[in-house]
Amino acid sequence: MIILAAGKGKRMHSSLPKVMHKVGGKSMLEHVLISAKKLNPSSINVVLSPKIESIKKSFGGYDIAWHSQSEQKGTADAVKIVLPSLKKDEKVLILYADTPLIDSNLLDKFINYMPKSDVKVLTVNLEKPFGYGRIIREQAEEEIISKIIEETEADDLQKNIKECNTGIIFSDVSTLNSLISEVKNDNSKKEFYLTDIVSIANLKNMMVVPLLSKETNSLLGVND
């Protein structure tokens, strides 16, 4: 399991690291760790920015492998940092530390959904999807995702799409290595987007399937 926690959280307007802001008396990262532990993963890997490594001492009660993303090169780069420490056939659930309400039962359902797929993406319909990556299907009812387009790269038509990427992805180490190695940073932010693995997987004739969840509130990230 990989938890991405290296985001700067500029919109929080606070000197406190984003993932350390409290929700219901616990930090956002601790909420995600609690849900993660319930799934009994073989390992929990958390990716941090070097600037907030001091938060490690707050999680001494958890068995965590910490990883440092020295430069903010994007989510694909953050995952790439962890992969060499994992077994090639290991299954990987990718979570974000700023989704504190994520439910372990939903994650368990997601992990076991469509077991023969190569990549799984947890999605949600939002009435106000601004800021989220949009899910692109060749046909509206099709059970295969062709690509995920980030808000900053989407055209006006794509911005009208309500189905959004939660960021939660499930695959295996070998597949992720293969796909991430081909991710490029030719976008407006010059970052390596993890979402680009979807279109790359399609080019490789891999099966990328979405699980559209109705649990909207538990899947929303915290930005302010």
Which ranges hold each PLM region?
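Conserved core of the sugar-phosphate nucleotidyltransferase
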Residues: 62, 102-188, 195-197, 206
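An accessory alpha-helical subdomain
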Residues: 189-194, 213-223
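Short glycine-enriched, charge-decorated loop/helix-capping segments at active-site entrances
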Residues: 16-22, 183-186
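Short beta-strand/turn micro-motifs composed of small residues
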Residues: 5, 48, 96, 123-124
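N-terminal nucleotide-binding beta1-loop-alpha1 segment
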Residues: 1-14
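Catalytic donor-sugar/metal-binding loop of nucleotide-sugar-dependent glycosyltransferases
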Residues: 199-213
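Short aromatic/basic micro-patch
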Residues: 22, 101, 170, 221-222
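Conserved N-terminal catalytic core of the sugar/cofactor nucleotidyltransferase
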Residues: 26-112
